[in-house]
Amino acid sequence: MTMGLRAPHWVAVGLLTWAALGLLVAGHEGHGDLHKDVEEDFHGHSHGHSHEDFHHGHSHGHSHEDFHHGHGHTHESIWHGHAHSHDHGHSREELHHGHSHGHSHDSLHHGGHGHAHREHSHGTSREAGAPGIKHHLDTVTLWAYALGATVLISAAPFFVLFLIPVESNSPRHRSLLQILLSFASGGLLGDAFLHLIPHALEPHSHHAPEQPGHGHSHSGQGPILSVGLWVLSGIVAFLVVEKFVRHVKGGHGHSHGHGDRHAHGDSHTHGDRHECSSKEKPSTEEEKEVGGLRKRRGGNTGPRDGPVKPQSPEEEKAGSDLRVSGYLNLAADLAHNFTDGLAIGASFRGGRGLGILTTMTVLLHEVPHEVGDFAILVQSGCSKKQAMRLQLVTAIGALAGTACALLTEGGAVDSDVAGGAGPGWVLPFTAGGFIYVATVSVLPELLREASPLQSLLEVLGLLGGVAMMVLIAHLE
């Protein structure tokens, strides 16, 4: 019971810690936006002032009254046109082009305007060049920062996993493991519906308003439909892989489903903790009444009562079959870490500050996600050390994604950070894999009979996993 009561405390402490870090990140973003707005206002004021001086000096420089009158009319219209274009954010090239067309004395006007325009261009390039020097790092420093941040994100969750008092899928750890599994299911579903799928749709929502009204209604449906199809493709692909692996594993025993149901004596020591599929649930409901089950089986179970524990082939077969869900989760996590690596590499290409901010956001996202993956692997039959080693393998995907982002030239950094990096099918396909693992492998484990307190803790764990993803989605 103490083990069961420790888990909510860990979840609560984790929620408070990650929430505090999230508020710090949100405060940093708000400060940056305010600073950017002040800079924009100051730049717009200085631009208008310099142009006003130029207009005054230019109207002062003409001596012929009739030409000045004609020019004043033209210049007034140009000034009006510039004010309109300035409100819309157009550059100075349009004003210079209008002056060149409107005046016959091109040499005098072009000379006076060219001096003022050159001064303004110099000031603008100097202001724009300073952030470029700050943000764009040299190659060695860029790779060091990006790969170091990726290693940090991959290694940081292990410190949390060391604190989880679960060594294996044993009865004394079962209540805590069930709570961690519920947290994992909430994290997987929240990650799929609040992070991966919205980011897959985000590039299309950005491009849609730029299109004409007639094209928006037709072209906007195609990309959105493709995202939904890729999500379904991920679910179907994971289903096909699991059925194929189970068929191959069950080929040695002629019929896997029949063999598992035929050997209930074996499953009462191993299967109550490892069975994930629906066809094995009838045996799990009867495992608590071992004596009654043996009486029901009669002569079939009598001869097997003795050699149940030493019969390692049956146990290995059941354990290996039930680890399929764990390996499927690892495959989905590998693809997900690849997208995280793409985001980190692309953000550091945009600047050190943006890279650090993205690293903190991904770290907040990865810690609860890795805890859930650890619970799924332990539930699938791995020991604590095996589960941590397998999770370390998924760090290869993050490093590969970071390297791809650093080696790829071009592309908008904002779209990469938003999750649009890489092929458009990666995010929705990964989301489909997460949905499959959460609904097929994890949620059925939460349907077993449990005490009211245990059931309440499991529901709270699921809501805690979703709440973490809501917080992270808000920060992003």
UniProtKB/Swiss-Prot annotation:
Q: Name one GO molecular function term.
A: zinc ion transmembrane transporter activity
> According to the UniProt entry, which residue ranges have a biased composition of type Basic and acidic residues?
35-109, 257-292
Q: Which Gene Ontology cellular component annotation is one that this UniProt entry carries? A: Golgi apparatus
Specify residue ranges for compositional bias: Basic residues.
110-120
Report the domain of life of the source organism: Eukaryota
Q: Which keywords accompany this UniProt record?
A: Endoplasmic reticulum, Golgi apparatus, Ion transport, Membrane, Methylation, Phosphoprotein, Transmembrane, Transmembrane helix, Transport, Zinc, Zinc transport
Phosphoserine found at: 283
Task: Please give the record's induction comment.
Answer: Down-regulated in an insulin-resistant, and high-fat diet state.
Name the organs or tissues of expression.
Widely expressed. Highly expressed in the intestinal crypts.
Q: Which residues cross the membrane?
A: 7-27, 146-166, 177-197, 222-242, 393-413, 417-437
Listed as disulfide-bonded, the cysteine pairs are none
Protein family: Belongs to the ZIP transporter (TC 2.A.5) family. KE4/Catsup subfamily.
Name recorded for this polypeptide: Zinc transporter SLC39A7
Q: Which organism is it from?
A: Mus musculus
From which lineage does this chain's organism come?
Eukaryota, Metazoa, Chordata, Craniata, Vertebrata
Which gene is annotated as encoding this protein in its UniProt record? Answer: Slc39a7
